[in-house]
């Protein structure tokens, strides 16, 4: 009931004179202001549970500095550095050694290790310089993803110029899960791919943590602990989890002119199917009148034992026209898709961390939708999409913020039978063919500003080698593209969208009212959106390009994991001629979950 009241409130906002629609204008240019042939899957996809990734905790440095005066000379001329695996391997009075010797010790990148320690040979060694040598060795190991190493200089006679150093690298001992309540310990420890008594590779372990933390119902971090045996290190997977079921309901005004702006939604997320951490998600979406749009969508995410991820997702949508002359005209579409994702090795340079993955898959889309293009419904239009997809994802984090990159390459061989042919595609968009290639790139940079302000820059670029069917075109207008315009007011084959957004520091309203248990956050937003698109091959009467631009303000408000509200109000700076010419509008989304 609360959702309905909130929806009514949202409609009241839109009924303000600043947001009141004017005369309805339907564009007749094919592909530029068309009703999308299939409801965008992202619009009706199940709402995600926000994940909280954790980083591995660095091992405590157990190596101790040499005490005493750092200027005290220990040896006038260092002739040899001998590295041994245990204190028991130190040889009293060792004299027959020269240069750098590794006795039963294996280091990562031996040539680089020699380059780190060999400059000390032939030098006068003080206590201070010896401490620098020890820290340089520890840093070398960490730079090579070996975080657990003890570098010990035992008591010895070094007047002969030979210095023996114990290099004790931690090996894998026990792997245990602690703190987990709803997920089994075996499920968590199986997500860490290490060999008993094997080396501890921090980069590989961070990849394992990322794999475990794909499940949004748990957060796992790694703590290194001394093992039972000398040289062993236990891996403690400290986990904070919650009951792996979330149900939610909400409202958005993300609909279109033909089927109504109101969208009511309800769904669930389940995060431990078969006790394997598999995720099952479902959402039902309907229009305000309950008949203009009815959509089912779902996804299944299966983390595989070898660290890859298999995902299936799909949707089924029924539509019915909401405005003259489209009243009663029905359409139907569905989609079945799959993706196989492979994480790539991450790398860490200084304080910059970069993580990436690649994925491949296939999309099948069926679209039978007579609510097409222009002022009058076309004859029944029917087309099938059969396309291969290659995806690249990258995330870079640094002290100043985060950069994300997502690239999707879509390839359709064409003429795969049924309604996957040039005749069907040309019927929904003049010049479109069933064989095509197009690429979509999305890049975003979040930069931390002074006083906890932040700046977000986001860009989307799409390019194609031919005219595309409506379901594959780049859409302009709506809360996640160019705000202030109707949802997918403009659709084109090629184009770009750019967003600049400034966000204030978050405010805890509950804290201000002395209700810290509320755990809420309020944030204000100011933004400028710009988009420009065109079709690959222009039809007679089509404009060369259609730019859109808007400025506005908004807010984001959350209460723990139970309530999420977004609200934006934007003013158009450029008119497309395709909308109802209201010049501005709001975009609102509300989700209640438990």
Where are the regions a protein language model picked out?
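Bacterial N-terminal signal peptides
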Residues: 21-33
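Immediate N-terminus of the mature polypeptide
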Residues: 2-14, 20, 35-442, 446-498, ...
């Amino acid at each position: 009931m609360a959702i309905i009241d909130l929806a009514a409130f949202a409609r009241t906002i839109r009924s303000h004179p600043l947001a009141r629609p004017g005369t309805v204008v339907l564009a007749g240019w094919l592909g530029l202001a068309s009703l999308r042939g299939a409801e965008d899957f992202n619009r009706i996809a199940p709402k995600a549970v926000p994940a909280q990734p954790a980083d591995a905790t660095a091992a405590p440095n157990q190596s101790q500095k040499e005490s005493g005066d750092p200027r005290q000379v220990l040896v006038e001329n260092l002739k040899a550095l001998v590295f041994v695996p245990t204190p028991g391997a130190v040889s009293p009075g060792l004299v027959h050694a020269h240069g750098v010797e590794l006795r039963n010790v294996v280091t990562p990148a031996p040539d680089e290790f020699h380059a780190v320690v060999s400059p000390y040979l032939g030098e006068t060694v003080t206590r201070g310089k010896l401490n620098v040598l020890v820290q340089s060795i520890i840093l070398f190991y960490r730079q090579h993803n070996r975080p657990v190493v003890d570098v010990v200089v035992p008591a010895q006679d070094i007047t002969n110029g030979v210095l023996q150093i114990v290099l004790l690298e931690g090996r894998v001992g026990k792997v245990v899960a602690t703190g987990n309540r709803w997920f089994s310990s075996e499920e968590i420890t199986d997500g860490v791919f290490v060999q008993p008594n094997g080396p501890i590779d921090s980069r590989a372990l961070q990849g394992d943590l990322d794999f475990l933390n794909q499940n949004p119902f748990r957060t796992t971090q790694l703590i290194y602990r001394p093992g039972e045996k000398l040289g062993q290190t236990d891996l403690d997977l400290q986990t904070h989890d919650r009951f792996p079921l979330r149900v939610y309901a909400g409202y958005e005004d993300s609909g279109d002119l033909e089927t109504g702006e109101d969208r009511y939604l309800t769904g669930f997320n389940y995060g431990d199917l078969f006790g394997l951490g598999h995720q099952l998600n479902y959402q039902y979406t309907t229009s305000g009148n309950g008949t203009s749009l009815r959509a089912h969508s779902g996804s299944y995410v299966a983390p595989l034992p070898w660290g890859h991820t298999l995902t299936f997702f799909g949707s089924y949508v029924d539509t019915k026209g909401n405005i003259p002359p489209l009243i009663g005209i029905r359409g139907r579409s569905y989609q079945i898709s799959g993706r196989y994702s492979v994480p790539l090795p991450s790398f860490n340079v200084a304080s910059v961390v970069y993580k990436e993955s690649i994925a491949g898959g296939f999309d099948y889309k069926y679209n039978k939708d007579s609510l097409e293009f222009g002022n009058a419904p076309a004859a029944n239009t029917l087309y099938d999409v059969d396309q291969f997809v290659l995806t690249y994802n990258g995330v870079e984090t640094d002290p100043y913020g985060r950069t994300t990159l997502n690239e999707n390459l879509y390839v359709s061989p064409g003429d795969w039978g049924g309604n996957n042919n040039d005749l069907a595609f040309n019927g929904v968009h003049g010049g479109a063919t069933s064989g095509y290639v197009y690429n979509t790139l999305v890049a975003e940079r979040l930069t931390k500003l002074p006083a906890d302000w932040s700046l977000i820059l986001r860009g989307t670029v799409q390019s194609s080698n031919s005219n595309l069917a409506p379901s594959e075109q780049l859409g302009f207008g709506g809360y996640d593209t160019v705000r202030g315009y109707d949802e997918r007011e403009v659709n084109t084959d090629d184009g770009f969208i750019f967003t600049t957004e400034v966000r204030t520091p978050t405010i805890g309203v509950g804290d201000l009212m002395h209700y810290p248990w509320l755990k809420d956050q309020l944030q204000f937003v100011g933004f400028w959106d710009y988009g420009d698109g065109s079709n690959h091959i222009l039809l007679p009467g089509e404009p060369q390009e259609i730019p859109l631009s808007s400025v506005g303000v908004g807010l984001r408000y959350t209460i723990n994991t139970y309530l999420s509200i977004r609200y934006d109000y934007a003013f158009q700076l450029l008119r497309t001629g395709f909308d109802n010419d209201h010049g501005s509008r709001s975009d609102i989304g509300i989700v209640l979950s438990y």
